[in-house]
Amino acid sequence: MEKVAARGIKIDLHIHSEYSKAKDGQKVAENTLNNVPILVQGLCDNQVEMCAITDHDTFDYDIYSELKKEESKDNCIQKVLPGIEFSVEFIEGKVIHIVTIFDDRDDEKVRNIQNIMINGKGKTCYKKTKEAYTKSDYFDILSEINIDFIMIAHQKKTPSSQHKPHANDVMSLGKEVFNELVFMDYFDAYEFRNKKNEIYNKIYSFEK
């Protein structure tokens, strides 16, 4: 049988720029358009071939397009995708972060993401008191963006962990909700802090 992928590649779909300062503070202050070459060097040092800048609840086309130029250069970067890390009040009082990655083939639609997030639903639907979108508004925004997407949920601990879940982690929704999401294949993927989480999730799913 022919393989879909001949080899594994390194990807990083969770990079923040200065446009995440509202939540990340000064630690991203130097992650500017002018410093994209420094980012590229770091990605190449780690042999990352696919990447995305996924700022908190916003999108900047200029910094995306500057990084995307690297696709045509003779370095490790083969693909740059547009994305946003959305803060979503998934259930009452529980906000989780969903890294949302978009198809890059329609550049006009990709360019329009910035307008939607800054001047459209991305601005008007944002609940400042919660620092998040409602689940309904999140999907309304995706509908307006009108680009194929994948959703990647934060999960930094294993389902069997006895420690308190991280804030904005999908496990913070509670075990019952987490079970439902896993078995419904609600999210396309989960973001793991380490490889063990992936293994434990597979075992957990099989056991259930």
What are these regions (language model features)?
Residues 1-93:
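An N-terminally biased module of ancient metal coordination in phosphate/nucleic-acid-related enzymes
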Residues 1-36, 62, 118-208:
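Domain-core and long-helix interface of multi-subunit machines
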Residues 38-40, 80-81, 108-112, 127-129, ...:
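Short, surface-exposed, polar/charged, turn-prone segments marking secondary-structure boundaries
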Residues 40-46, 112-117, 130-133:
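Short C-terminal domain-edge/linker segments immediately following a structured domain
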Residues 50, 81, 97-101, 150-152, ...:
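Ordered hydrophobic segments in well-structured contexts
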Residues 86, 102-104, 157:
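Short, flexible active-site-adjacent loop segments at beta-strand->alpha-helix junctions, enriched
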Residues 91-128:
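A basic- and aromatic-enriched beta-loop-alpha substructure that forms the phosphate/nucleotide-
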